[in-house]
């Protein structure tokens, strides 16, 4: 759900029909000045190479946190991304203020984590339906966010389109459930608990 302060502006944007990535023809037809996307958007199977758009006079920006290289952190990817957006759109002061607010929130979380005196093992899980799952490894920014909150990823590499038997091979203290449908947190928890493949996982039984 979009923050209330931005909901009206977001609702006014034209939304293309494609659920994930529009076609190249759709993008070109919109005559954009700038494309901002994830790294996998600019592949031969999706929108094509960024330089094809630059040659057309269209700027292209790849969100740093989506470049699967190393172990991305908020400090190395998210904060610079916000700074770049501030520079591109001429709102550097607002971008700096927003980043400072995020840093304060992260610091507060890290302080609570330290005061708790305990860390948890976590699985970062996404369900695709038809008994297929993905587990996120350290190449995703969510790994750093979880670590800052006191949860250590039990998975050391990305696992895509795997069956439940692979998921059940792990026993995390908690499950961080990635739900792309943008549903409320409680609805996502209900969905996870209702998955018949995962009923025997301790984290699911204990609603964690």
Predicted features by range, described:
Residues 33, 173-176:
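Conserved acidic residues
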Residues 24-28, 143, 164-168:
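Short hydrophobic/charged patches on amphipathic alpha-helices used for structural packing
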Residues 1-42, 154:
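A short, structured surface patch at a secondary-structure boundary
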Residues 11, 55-57, 149, 205:
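Short, structured coil segments at secondary-structure junctions
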Residues 41-55, 178-193:
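A ligand-binding cleft/hinge motif common to bilobed small-molecule-binding domains
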Residues 3, 34, 40-44, 66-71, ...:
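Solvent-exposed loop/turn segments at secondary-structure junctions
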Residues 34, 49-129, 207-208:
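Extracytoplasmic substrate-binding proteins
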Residues 2-5, 20, 133-163:
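Alpha-helical, coiled-coil/dimerization segments enriched in small aliphatic residues
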